């Protein structure tokens, strides 16, 4: 079973933040898979699981997960899910924002994440390894927007604006197409 986890913060306040691009990707992936395989999905709506403190869509082949902890505690939910379902780390994909990659770009890499990402550090700490797949979604655009001096933490909690929204939507479509191949 493949597990694709989108990292983000719960609540409407954070819904369109750069930090929530992981949630955006798994939501778009769920929508695409629902269209491609309508009979295969047991329940295509994200359902809250108290056991894992996460919203989950489950099929026989995969789980889509949105931890409902805040970003910096994402590892708690991920570790519980991996233990419960006996997930091999080679089947785990963590989708997250990445300030080391320019907006409009992404990388899917095994065992390699950004220099600093507290949500990812939480996952690594709780799993005791970094040997899983990282779907690194580029959100860096500070120089173009004239925000070069804005700290990463502040910048990542800001919403996408203007043309960034169009760029992100296009990038999410590409990522989803790659992830469909992973779970198919």
Per-region residue spans from a language model:
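Hydrophobic secondary-structure segments that place a key small or acidic residue at a functional site
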Residues: 117
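Phosphate- and other anionic-substrate recognition elements at nucleic-acid/protein interfaces
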Residues: 114
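Intrinsically disordered, low-complexity regions enriched in acidic/Ser/Thr/Pro/Gln residues
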Residues: 156-159
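Nucleotide and nucleotide-moiety/phosphate-recognizing core
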Residues: 2-111, 121, 125, 131-136, ...
């Amino acid at each position: 079973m493949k597990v694709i986890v989108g990292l983000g913060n719960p609540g409407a306040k954070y819904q369109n933040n750069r930090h929530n691009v992981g949630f955006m990707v798994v939501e778009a992936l769920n929508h695409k898979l629902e269209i491609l395989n309508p009979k295969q999905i047991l329940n295509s709506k994200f359902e809250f699981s108290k056991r894992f403190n996460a919203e989950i869509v489950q099929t026989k082949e995969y789980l889509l997960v949105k931890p409902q902890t805040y970003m910096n505690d994402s590892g708690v939910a991920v570790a519980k899910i991996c233990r419960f379902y006996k997930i091999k780390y080679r089947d785990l994909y963590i989708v997250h924002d990445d300030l080391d990659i320019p907006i409009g770009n992404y990388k899917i890499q095994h065992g390699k994440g950004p220099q600093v990402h507290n949500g990812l550090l939480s996952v690594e700490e709780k799993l005791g390894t970094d040997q899983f797949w990282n779907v690194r979604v580029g959100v860096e655009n500070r120089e173009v927007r004239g925000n070069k001096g804005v700290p990463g933490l502040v910048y990542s909690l800001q919403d996408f604006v203007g043309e960034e929204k169009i760029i992100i939507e296009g990038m999410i479509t590409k990522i989803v197409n790659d992830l469909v191949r992973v779970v198919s």
